[in-house]
From Swiss-Prot:
Region spans: RNA binding: 250-256, 274-278
Catalytic reaction(s) noted: 7-aminomethyl-7-carbaguanine + guanosine(34) in tRNA = 7-aminomethyl-7-carbaguanosine(34) in tRNA + guanine
Quaternary organization: Homodimer. Within each dimer, one monomer is responsible for RNA recognition and catalysis, while the other monomer binds to the replacement base PreQ1.
Cofactor remark: Binds 1 zinc ion per subunit.
Recorded family membership: Belongs to the queuine tRNA-ribosyltransferase family.
Name of the protein this chain belongs to: Queuine tRNA-ribosyltransferase
One record GO biological process: tRNA wobble guanine modification
Function: Catalyzes the base-exchange of a guanine (G) residue with the queuine precursor 7-aminomethyl-7-deazaguanine (PreQ1) at position 34 (anticodon wobble position) in tRNAs with GU(N) anticodons (tRNA-Asp, -Asn, -His and -Tyr). Catalysis occurs through a double-displacement mechanism. The nucleophile active site attacks the C1' of nucleotide 34 to detach the guanine base from the RNA, forming a covalent enzyme-RNA intermediate. The proton acceptor active site deprotonates the incoming PreQ1, allowing a nucleophilic attack on the C1' of the ribose to form the product.
Known pathway: tRNA modification; tRNA-queuosine biosynthesis
Active site: 95 (proton acceptor), 269 (nucleophile)
Single annotated GO MF: tRNA-guanosine(34) queuine transglycosylase activity
Binding site for substrate: 95-99, 149, 192, 219
């Protein structure tokens, strides 16, 4: 059987061990480490596919749970799959819906068969199983699909986490058996286990034995301190095959992207750039800027003097502040564009630093300019 997803390792950074690679998908090949913008409902909020392409986005994310509810996976399938439905001819990854089931629904009951929960839109009772999650993702037609896993809260006890990862491993095997399009879609397994090294080892061992074409590290960026996330990555990524892509789910702050790459991660995704953009917060080479603040009312400089994105080439902080203060959609478009561009370009810089065997030096320079080295530094 030919796998639709292939990872090609190009170089390892001598200074850090970070990996430069190429992710080959049915819709193109893309350099890693990469940041994947999130388009929950088959759109990256306020941005067009053409804009994402001009930024250099390669793979984008869509959400199985949300698309199952609206418009329905049957409608997307009828349209010719997600690529045709949203006019995107590059890579797409869909998550399994597990995270939303565990985070959005107040009522839920976990059983061996699957999860019973309430629709967060109207309160209807719903059921999602490994088989159903894969069926929906087969219909959506993304290049990379994810196994259905349990997403335990942080913190969780060792006993609970052990039961959880063992269930997730059984569910992963059921996902593989249910997968109807293995020659067109790569199904990734998700390693869980919280902060417990022994459980991460057990989870990784179970999943690697099933020989997925790629692996995600799940259960991080759920409220734990950054030091815990980095420590977990340090003992988890070496457990995963070197010839398969490694995906850190739900992580998008600049410091975590760099620290994740240093610990062997190839793929990242997060709603962060568009979510904070809608609130008027932007990431710049000199740190975060809350554009609504009064100090920018007469600031006629670009958001980031070192950025060449469409927003920074054409508009000032004062103008963007005015738009955001007046709830103008164009303001949100401009901040979202800049933030997504910023993270895509950051990963270009990370890849170049790996080529030059100087990623640790780059990290130190970036952290110093951004302000991550200051006491009580913000997360983004």
């Amino acid at each position: 059987m030919t796998t639709p997803i292939r990872f090609e390792l190009i170089k390892t950074c001598r200074q850090t061990g970070a990996r430069l690679g190429i992710l080959h998908t049915p819709h193109g090949s893309f350099e890693t480490p990469m940041f994947m913008p999130v388009g929950t409902l088959a759109t990256v909020k306020t941005l067009s596919p053409e804009e994402l392409k001009e930024m250099g986005a390669g793979v984008i994310l869509s959400n199985t749970y949300h698309l199952w509810l609206r418009p329905g996976h049957d409608i997307v399938e009828e349209a010719g799959g997600l690529h045709a439905f949203m006019n995107w001819d590059r890579g797409i990854l869909t998550d399994s819906g597990g995270f939303q089931v565990f985070s959005l629904s107040e009522f839920r009951r976990i059983e061996e068969e699957g999860v019973y929960f309430r629709n967060h839109l109207n309160g209807d009772k719903l059921f999602l199983s490994p088989e159903k999650a894969v069926e929906i993702q087969n219909a959506l037609g993304a290049d990379i699909i994810m196994a259905f896993d349990e997403c335990p809260p942080y913190p969780a006890t060792y006993e609970y986490m052990k039961q959880s990862i063992e269930r997730t491993s059984r569910w992963a095997e059921r996902c593989l058996k249910a997968h109807r399009r293995p020659n067109e879609q790569g199904l990734f397994g998700i390693v869980q286990g919280g902060e417990y090294e022994e459980l991460r080892r057990q989870s990784a061992r179970d999943l690697v034995s099933l020989d997925f074409p790629g692996y995600a590290v799940g259960g991080l960026s759920v409220g734990e301190p950054k030091e815990v996330m980095n420590r977990v990555l340090e003992f988890t990524t070496p457990l995963l095959p070197a010839d398969k892509p490694r995906y850190l789910m739900g992580v998008g702050s600049p410091d975590s992207l760099i620290d994740g790459a240093i610990r062997g991660i190839d793929m990242f995704d997060c709603v962060l750039p568009t979510r904070i953009g809608r609130n008027g917060t932007v990431m710049t080479s000199e740190g975060r800027v809350v554009i609504k603040n009064a100090q920018y009312a007469r600031d006629f400089s670009p958001l980031d003097p070192n950025c060449d994105c469409y927003t920074c080439r054409n508009y000032t902080r004062a103008y963007i502040r005015h738009l955001i203060k007046c709830d103008e959609t164009f303001g949100i478009r401009l901040t979202s564009y800049h933030n997504v561009y910023f993270l895509i370009k950051l990963m270009e810089q990370v890849r170049q630093a790996i080529r030059e065997d100087r990623l640790a030096d780059f990290r130190e320079e970036f952290f110093e300019c951004y302000g991550f080295n200051k006491p009580n530094a913000k997360n983004f």
